[in-house]
Every structure is written in C-alpha cells, then in structure tokens.
From Swiss-Prot:
Record bears the keyword Nucleotidyltransferase: no
Entry's localization field: Cytoplasm
Catalytic activity: tRNA(Ser) + L-serine + ATP = L-seryl-tRNA(Ser) + AMP + diphosphate + H(+); tRNA(Sec) + L-serine + ATP = L-seryl-tRNA(Sec) + AMP + diphosphate + H(+)
Domain notes: Consists of two distinct domains, a catalytic core and a N-terminal extension that is involved in tRNA binding.
Name listed for the protein in its UniProt record: Serine--tRNA ligase
Length: 414
C-alpha cells in the first residue's frame, strides 16, 4: 500500500507519478477524502470515549458518596449509544479506505521514464551481440518437436492449451538449468529456501496479488489456498508480520519453484511453443533490506541475473521499464530480455523490481532501527525463468542439421 501520510503532504507528486500507471486523479481524490474523513470520525469516537471515561469515573465517586446518580446513568447510557454508533462509523470508513487503498498501485521512482507501454521502455545496456548463423535459424517449437524434447500434443492432451511435456534431453536440460541457476545464485550470497506452492489469501495480499489480480490465480475450491504465481509470494512472506533486527539486513534468498498463472488477458498471444505457459518453472531472487540498502541490492540482483545469462553465452539487454509497463507493486523494474534468433527479437527472461516499502506495508515487515520499528524495502526478480532460458539455449545453440549444442557450463550438470 502507498503511504497515506505522504499522499497528504505530496499530493501533486503522487498524482503525476500514478498517472503514469494509468491511475485517475479522481481515485486519489476519493482516497485522500476518505482518509481525512476517517481522521475526523476517529476524533469524534475519541471524544465520546473520553466523555464515557470521565462520566464513569464521576459516577463511581458520587455512588460511593451516596449521591443520586440516576441522571448521570441516563447520560452515560445516551453517550454509550452514541459511542457505539461512532465506533460503527469508524469501522465503515476504515473498510472503505482499505478497499480504495488496496486498488492503488505503488508510486514510481524518480528515474522511471513516463510512458504508456512496453514500446516506451528504455534500453540501458546490451550484453553480447545477437547470435549470427549462416542458415535460417528455427524457432524453439520446431527444434523441440523434431528432436523429441518438447511434446506439445501430449501436454494439451493431459491439461489443455499452454501446457508442455519435456522429454529426454529436453527434460535433462531443464533439470540442469535449475541446478546451475541455484548454484550460481547461491555463490552470489543468496540463501536457498524451499517453500510451499499453496499459500493463503493473506500471503497473496502481502505481495500485492490480491485482491486486484485474483482472476490470474488458480484457487483451491472451498479452501483459502491458491497456487503460487511466483515464489516471490511465499519467500517475501516468510517475514510477514515480523520485526527483523537491523543487523540481519539485508536478507537475500533464492528459490526454485513451479509457478501457476491463468494468463488472463493473454488470449491470442504466444499461442505456439513455451513462451507463455499456465505452469512454468522459475528460480527467483528475493531480498529484504533497509531503505538505504535497496538500490545497491537491486544492482546486485540485476548483475547476478545478467552474469548468469552471460555465463550461458546468451545475448541479452537491460530494459528500464516505463511507468505504464510497471507492475502493480513495483517502484522500479529492470527487465532482462534475451535474444531469440528464431523469432528474430528480444524476449523478457527476467524482471527485477524494487517495491520500496509498498509490500512491506501490506505484509507488515519491519526492522528495529534503534527504538523505532521501520518498514523494510523488498525486492524480487527471476534468475532465471527456466523455460525461457531453455528456449534461448535451443535457438542460440542450434546447428544447421537441427541438433543443439549444450553450453559448456551446463555439461557437468547433464
């Protein structure tokens, strides 16, 4: 959630930044109005509580002195009723404030470019030149089917569209990538964690998926459990409602998991191959930091994922996302896009974000700063998306005869 006190004192800045995320000023007007109304209603409630306490004390004194307290009892009863009404009004305004604030995304960092969509993202770095061939390179689905690595037909038979079966060398390469990514990230100081794939609604609320993006989640019928869309959700929430000692920060973690997404709104996009799946694997980085550490840790996470791609010999570029392409919880995001010669374009393979204190406010993750409890900053990003890395290797390491060379660093993992 955004900081409502900052919204109050920096209203114009919030309007400008959130306009870049397609948030109308009228929503912020309503949010601020409700926030101010709630403060007034709380003052009224506190006034009734003070009157109740004072009159209750007065009643006790007069009763012990043997005085007539019938009129005072009537006043107390009237005030008690008014107090109950005021308390109910406060609860209604608190609920209204929550409903509005839960739908407002994070504000952007100052260096995030204003833009409408992915076409306005800015390339800030290119690593390795796009792979050149003396033959026309094939796309991954053609290579995968001809080699027997990717079985789209049986994936669809088992589960429907956007599911794939990996077989033989395809499955072995996928497993090798997971182990290599975990080892690479661990060597960079990220602690390996293993988490549940089913989480509660409160957990998803903490990282911002609920309530706004429920349509993209898979829910267990009749239970408060959802399949995770990314391991960012359970890993970040390991510290939900926790006060961390300052000397423990930063906390840096890596996690392998399967991920599950409905892909609502993606109809007609990437219908062939493995680019966009309902179930996919990812190795994630999650960091929890002090506010003054998060920029440095963001750079570490970007470097980790980029160096991992470089070690695999995969050409890629760093894209600074514009305001209109930023995620709900993100204040700043760098996408790493890998070159796919079969498609003849770059495709996202990692998205690394600093959410500042947005998720921490929702999940109540704090650290002890002297005598004060302060909100942490949380960061997350892929290092890397396993399926897309497999695709990138297939397309960049293909040979004219349709076979695929295995990158040197992966051979001992095969």
């Amino acid at each position: 959630m955004i900081n409502l006190k900052l919204l109050e004192t920096n209203y114009d800045e919030f309007v400008k930044k959130l306009e870049g995320k397609n948030v109308k000023a009228s929503l912020l007007d309503e949010l601020l109005h409700t926030f101010n109304e709630l403060k007034q209603k709380r003052k009224a409630l506190e006034n009734f509580q003070a009157i109740q306490n004072a009159k209750s004390k007065e009643l006790g004194v007069k009763a012990r002195a043997g005085e007539d307290v019938s009129e005072l009892k009537s006043e107390l009863n009237l005030n008690k009723a008014a107090l109950a009404d005021a308390d109910e009004i406060v609860k209604q305004y608190e609920e209204k404030l929550e409903q509005i604030s839960f739908s407002v995304p994070n504000i952007t960092d100052d260096d995030v470019p204003f833009g409408k969509d992915e076409n306005d993202n800015v390339c800030i770095k290119t690593v390795l030149e796009p792979t050149k061939f003396d033959f026309k390179p094939k796309e991954h689905w053609e290579l995968g089917e001809s080699l027997g690595w990717l079985d789209f037909e049986r994936g669809a038979k088992l589960s429907g569209s956007r599911f794939t079966v990996l077989r033989g060398m395809g499955a072995r390469l996928g497993r090798a990538l997971v182990n290599y990514m975990i080892d690479f990230n661990s060597a960079r100081g990220f602690e390996l964690v293993n988490v549940p794939y089913l989480v509660s609604s409160n957990t998803l609320f903490g990282t911002g998926q609920l309530p706004k993006f429920e349509e993209d989640l898979y829910k267990v019928r009749d239970e408060d459990l959802y399949l995770i869309p990314t391991s960012e959700v359970p890993v970040t929430n390991l510290y939900n409602d926790t006060i961390i000692e300052a000397e423990q920060l930063p906390i840096k973690m890596t996690c392998y998991s399967a991920c599950f997404r409905q892909e609502a709104g993606s109809a007609g996009r990437d219908t062939r191959g493995m680019i966009r799946q309902h179930q996919f694997e990812k190795v994630e980085l999650v960091s929890i930091t002090k506010p003054d550490q998060s920029e440095g840790v963001l750079a570490e996470m970007i470097s980790c994922a980029s160096d991992l791609l470089t070690s695999l010999g995969l050409p890629h570029r760093h894209m600074l996302l514009c305001s209109g392409d930023l995620g709900f919880s993100a204040a700043k995001t760098i996408d790493l896009e890998v070159w796919l010669p079969g498609q003849g374009k770059y495709r996202e393979i990692s998205s690394i974000s600093n959410t500042r204190d947005f998720q921490a406010r929702r999940a109540k993750i704090r650290f002890k700063d002297g005598k004060k409890n302060m909100l942490v900053n949380t960061l997350n990003g892929s290092s890397l998306a396993v399926g897309r890395t497999l695709i990138a290797i297939m397309e960049n390491y293909q040979k004219a005869d349709g076979t695929i060379e295995i990158p040197e660093v992966l051979k001992r993992y095969m």
